[in-house]
């Protein structure tokens, strides 16, 4: 079963640190990065199996929180095709 994890952080350094932890912690793949406010608000999206995505998000949020502020994070299991189209457009 596929899932996505969204990690929204304040600051690019926190996003990179969180993403690094996510891809090292589990078998997930980066599918989207969105930068807002000149990189002061960054959302990282990864995909993989549900258990891998959950483990990755836990590790990524913890790592990002050490160097910045985590605004929001969420796992979406079996995202609708329209959600995936929105993310990859």
Model-derived segments and their meaning:
Residues 1-40, 45-89:
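Long, contiguous binding/interaction regions
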